[in-house]
Amino acid sequence: MSRTSIDAGKLDQAVELLELQESPAGSWTWQSVRPARAQVTLSTDRNLFSQVGIGARGAQLIVRRQAMTLHNALRWGEQHLFLTSIVPEGRLHLRLEAALVTVDTVTVQKDETTVEKTFPGVLTEKYARHAQEWPMSVNELGLVLVTPKPIALRPGTLVKVRGALWEVLVPHELDPYKNEYEIGRTVDL
């Protein structure tokens, strides 16, 4: 544990602590718990918030010590911060590591027209595969969908995100704070 003293005047950025909440209708959303002040430092390094996909730009934050876990997230202006590390910094503060991500609204589809549930998710790239089939080519697109831990999906489930239907292919659910799903779809060229 560091014995560093933090100047309160350096906590000059407004952030909001968020937690995932389920509505009576079954949709999940990030809701503000409380405002906080933070010292925010953007990094040129990538934050590897996903074990399966590629990372995102990182940020380091210092906040006053408060109740929070990696199940929470932060909002900094319009930017969503996906928490990846929380470490005590002296007696009064916490040092946070976060990934700057875009949160999409994801729907689980029973079929192409029936929505089962809605939740926030983060897409990250995995890789794209190309297969030459006679007489045409297809692209097998693959992404990784990172979800809050309460969201569990089965292989074969259809999810709609950014206007396209994707199939859940491979679940990665061992992390105690999030789930990751390899999703894919085939597109004719």
Residue ranges and their predicted role:
Residues 155, 161-174:
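Low-complexity, intrinsically disordered Gly/Pro/Thr-rich segments
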Residues 145-146:
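Short, well-ordered beta-strand segments in soluble/periplasmic domains
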Residues 1-70, 77-141, 174-189:
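N-terminal disorder-to-order initiation segments that are Gly/Lys/Arg-biased
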Residues 71, 154-156:
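Loop/turn positions that initiate beta-strands
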